[in-house]
A protein has these predicted regions:
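Cyclic nucleotide-binding regulatory module and flanking cytosolic helices
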Residues: 1-37, 86-90
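Short, small/polar residue-rich loop motifs at catalytic or cofactor-binding pockets
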Residues: 27-28, 46-48
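Cyclic-nucleotide recognition modules
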Residues: 72-130
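A short beta-strand-loop-beta hairpin characteristic of the jelly-roll/cupin
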Residues: 59-71
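A small-molecule sensor/coupling module
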Residues: 112-154
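Short phosphate-coordinating micro-motif centered on Lys-Gly-acidic
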Residues: 40-46
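Phosphate-/nucleic-acid-contacting segments
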Residues: 153-155, 162-218
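Glycine- and acidic-residue-biased ligand/ion/polar-headgroup-sensing regions
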Residues: 38, 49-62, 78-79
Length: 218
């Protein structure tokens, strides 16, 4: 077991004081893994038993079809968690691959120890369960937004829908998106070159302005 982190800013631990981290993690159990960019944290069809919490770096949730085409469903970043969708169900088998998108350090905790009170009836278990329910609800919302984007027929419609969601989320028409061109193309499920051409057209037509991953809706 690795040294217990004193503070992890994950929403799973919302409402838990820094001094409570050590006894809490000692109770539920944990381990910390280090990964390099391109590593696989969990393969599709692998049974998931632990929740992963990203302490540094990021991980992509990726779906691959029979022809090897990969679609990035969502990027999980620092302090966010992954795997909870699968460990919560009756079937723990993952339907996606978790791919490390940059060097990462990940805290793993066993799901069953998070969701069930221990024999000592530690006070933080109820808080963990509340936080987990809230996290799953937020993840479902994010996936619904992704579905709204990719269901659009044209690249322009997908781009405008995605940028509109980002503007609403960040409460500004001037905002930064978390993707470069390659990642954005994967997220939108479109060809990168075609996406680049469409962005140029939209800028020339006065719909948007952008510099790298900084966008402004005009």
């Amino acid at each position: 077991m690795n040294e217990i982190p004193r503070k992890v800013n994950s929403p799973l631990f919302h409402g838990i004081k820094p001094e409570e981290m050590k006894p809490m993690l000692s109770c539920i159990g944990y381990h910390i893994g280090t990964f390099q960019k391109g590593d696989i944290v969990a393969f599709e069809e692998e049974n998931i038993r632990h929740i992963g919490i990203i302490m540094s770096g990021s991980v992509d949730m990726v779906k691959e079809d029979l022809w090897g085409n990969k679609t990035m469903l969502i990027r999980i970043r620092k302090d966010e968690l992954f795997g909870e969708t699968f460990v919560c169900g009756t079937d723990n088998q993952s339907v996606v691959t978790f791919l490390v998108s940059e060097d990462s350090e990940i805290l793993f905790v066993p799901f069953d120890r998070v969701m069930h009170n221990c024999t000592m009836a530690c006070s933080f278990h109820h808080r963990l369960i509340e936080n987990m329910v809230r996290i799953i609800a937020n993840k479902n919302r994010d996936l619904m937004r992704k579905l709204e984007v990719v269901s659009k027929r044209t690249i322009r419609e997908k781009v405008l829908t995605y940028l509109s969601i980002q503007a609403q989320t960040q409460a500004s028409r001037y905002f930064e998106i978390p993707f470069g061109r390659v990642e954005l193309a994967e997220y939108l499920c479109v060809d990168r070159s075609a996406l680049t051409r469409e962005l140029v057209k939209m800028q020339e037509e006065g719909l948007i302005d952008y510099d790298k991953n900084i966008f402004r809706i005009l």
